């Protein structure tokens, strides 16, 4: 059985675990770097990106996360997790993991009061998906080899590059688990290749 981890430092961790399990995989809350060895893929959940970065540093996750990526294991960043995954952050010369070849802008849809839901057309899904946006970032620029999966009002809100998936919204806050399912399928594909 596939095991997918959720970085459990902050954010909607339980909801992600519920979504993973609803897709037929096992979910594990990752609170220590050595637990990364137990999972086939990892979700970096929403929350607050600067707080998350501080916790990543405090619990010495930065290098283990980079090693995890270097092994080819899939990673999915949602909301603040997208910022952690991104190669570049607008207005900052200090990216976090720098893995997904995109430029992101923080809080680009406004402050908390500007939380909203929107029906999104997402590549790979037949029907629209309701995206829940909370102080969401968006992707200003998608670099080479990045596939844009969804846009909202001309702004990129989901993208994929190889083993990395990122989105501006919170897919775990709805009972529609199709976006999580896309990630589960990426992890399945990785695991099958790893077994060959």
Curated annotation (Swiss-Prot):
Entry keywords, A to Z: Glutamine amidotransferase, Hydrolase, Lyase, Pyridoxal phosphate
Effect of residue 48 to A: No activity, disturbing interaction with PdxS
A Pfam family it matches: SNO
The family this protein is said to belong to: Belongs to the glutaminase PdxT/SNO family.
Protein purpose: Catalyzes the hydrolysis of glutamine to glutamate and ammonia as part of the biosynthesis of pyridoxal 5'-phosphate. The resulting ammonia molecule is channeled to the active site of PdxS.
InterPro entries: Class_I_gatase-like (IPR029062), PdxT/SNO (IPR002161), PdxT/SNO_CS (IPR021196)
Enzyme Commission number, as recorded: 4.3.3.6, 3.5.1.2
Residues that coordinate or bind L-glutamine: 47-49, 106, 134-135
Organism of provenance: Bacillus subtilis (strain 168)
One biological process term in Gene Ontology: pyridoxine metabolic process
Domain of life, source organism: Bacteria
Name of this chain's protein: Pyridoxal 5'-phosphate synthase subunit PdxT
Record's subunit section: In the presence of PdxS, forms a dodecamer of heterodimers. Only shows activity in the heterodimer.
NCBIfam families: PLP_synth_Pdx2
Impact after mutating residue 135 to A: No activity, disturbing interaction with PdxS
